[in-house]
Amino acid sequence: MIRRAPTTLQLSHDDVTSLIDDLNEQKLKQQLNIEKTKYFQGKNGGSLHSNTDFQDTSQNIEDNNNDNDNDIDEDDDMSSYNDKAASVAHTRVLNSLHLSTDSNTAHETSNANDNHNPFYIREE
């Protein structure tokens, strides 16, 4: 068996300082994202669970854009809503499909007359 000598990484003081600064910046970004999530969940009365919650959130988006007097950047404000809206839409699409264990094909379980749904599998 071949053994290798242990390797050491030698960093200058500037390298260490740069790494520490990067780590602190990442921690701050993570904390900011956590605080944003808490803020928007509190503002919307909790996390989104259904399509009715999604509709309520879209109303909140319009209200917040009309009277946004605080210093929060509107792009950051909207990106959080867009993430939630995309999540709800994705969940709705997944809930409308189920995987058949017999034939391993997807079949839509609801809204069979939706001609614009790209995920709708039409049986021939």
UniProtKB/Swiss-Prot annotation:
Disulfide bonds: none annotated. Residues 47-59, 99-116 have a biased composition (Polar residues). Residues 40-87, 99-124 are annotated as: Disordered. Pfam families: ANAPC_CDC26. Pathway: Protein modification; protein ubiquitination. It is found in: Nucleus. Residues 64-78 have a biased composition (Acidic residues). The modification Phosphoserine is found at S12. One of its GO terms (cellular component) is anaphase-promoting complex. Keywords: Cell cycle, Cell division, Mitosis, Nucleus, Phosphoprotein, Ubl conjugation pathway. It comes from the Eukaryota. GO terms for biological process: anaphase-promoting complex-dependent catabolic process; cell division; chromatin organization; protein ubiquitination; regulation of meiotic cell cycle; regulation of mitotic cell cycle. Belongs to the CDC26 family. Component of the anaphase promoting complex/cyclosome (APC/C), a cell cycle-regulated E3 ubiquitin-protein ligase complex that controls progression through mitosis and the G1 phase of the cell cycle. The APC/C is thought to confer substrate specificity and, in the presence of ubiquitin-conjugating E2 enzymes, it catalyzes the formation of protein-ubiquitin conjugates that are subsequently degraded by the 26S proteasome. The APC/C is composed of at least 13 subunits that stay tightly associated throughout the cell cycle: APC1, APC2, APC4, APC5, APC9, APC11, CDC16, CDC23, CDC26, CDC27, DOC1, MND2 and SWM1. CDC26 is required to tether the essential subunits APC9, CDC27 and CDC16 to the complex. This is Anaphase-promoting complex subunit CDC26. It comes from Saccharomyces cerevisiae (strain ATCC 204508 / S288c).
